[in-house]
Amino acid sequence: MSSTTNSVKGKEVLKKLGELIPLNLAEKWDNVGLLVEPSNTDSMDIERIFLTNDLTEPVLQEAINEKASFIISYHPPLFNQFKTVNQKSISQRIAIKSIENRIPIYSPHSALDSCDGGLNDWISNALIKLNSGKGRSKPITPYQESLKSTQKISIYLHTNQPLTAEILKQLELNSNFQFYSTDKIELSCDQQQLLILINLIKSFSNEIKNWDIINQEKVLSLNNGSGKLVTLDDDGIDIDVIVKGVKELFNIEYVRIGRPLSGESKKIKTISLCAGSGGSVVFNAKADLYLTGELTHHAILDACAKGSYVIVCDHSNSERDYLPQILKPNLEKLFNGRIKVIVSKLDTDPLKVI
């Protein structure tokens, strides 16, 4: 990697961020991407990217003092729509001040949770390492990826009437061949190609027995999606080992733990996890342990009554250390050392144990 810090145009920064963290993975309710855009952001020379989990007013001033030219705030500082722009609300003051100082603000939020190599992968990989690397993880709710070829067509042929070279050529020009034999052809196409193919198939109807179309607009992703379900191989590990590992990963002194109400002590083989507020995600999978930033009182009671452990760490404690551990080096590599990446020193969880 080059050690020379130079600059990158704003347009390229936005493009590369979108490639690293695809925004289409964000939850529908979320507010992600470029949230504050000073004029001519595309042509700006971005020299210093400032990372924070929460963009508070003191953290924004820290970014200004650090001469940041671009802010990535994991949590979106702007969420609700507003009809006026004034100094009455914190979020609007942050937006105004960032524009006055010509600093764009970008938030990846739930897209970073769900992407391959994102926040939940960071946590699941650390848990698997506690078991000597023996285990695997998958999304609790896999992302449904759109396909370029949205239609699959199967054509069943009379074995004694092979298709002519001209017909095969026309099929190939208007679709993607997936399978071909003397009695069957499988191909895929997009919606625009479909009508052309239907008319083409009708033109050689004497050569075929029948044909069908399957809509395949969505496919489940193997790596992208909400939360992670971790399965540990062999006998699993003790809850105390996981508690220690979680504290070290999140760089915190304390976690809160709920134990099975039966008093039963058991090894942990399955862990359902989600950074932040994961109550709507983690309980979609049955697990020995539920790990997240925050849960409601009754959700914890219910899980413990069903014989599971629960670990909650406070919301942003389960997210913050991803920035220096993973995102900072990833961005330095992404921009080949041409941008200096700074992590906030003031950003911290608002709740403290005393």
From Swiss-Prot:
Disulfide bonds: none annotated. GO terms for cellular component: cytoplasm; mitochondrion. It comes from the Eukaryota. NCBIfam families: YbgI_SA1388. Belongs to the GTP cyclohydrolase I type 2/NIF3 family. PANTHER family: NGG1 INTERACTING FACTOR 3 (PTHR13799), NIF3-LIKE PROTEIN 1 (PTHR13799:SF13). This is NIF3-like protein 1.
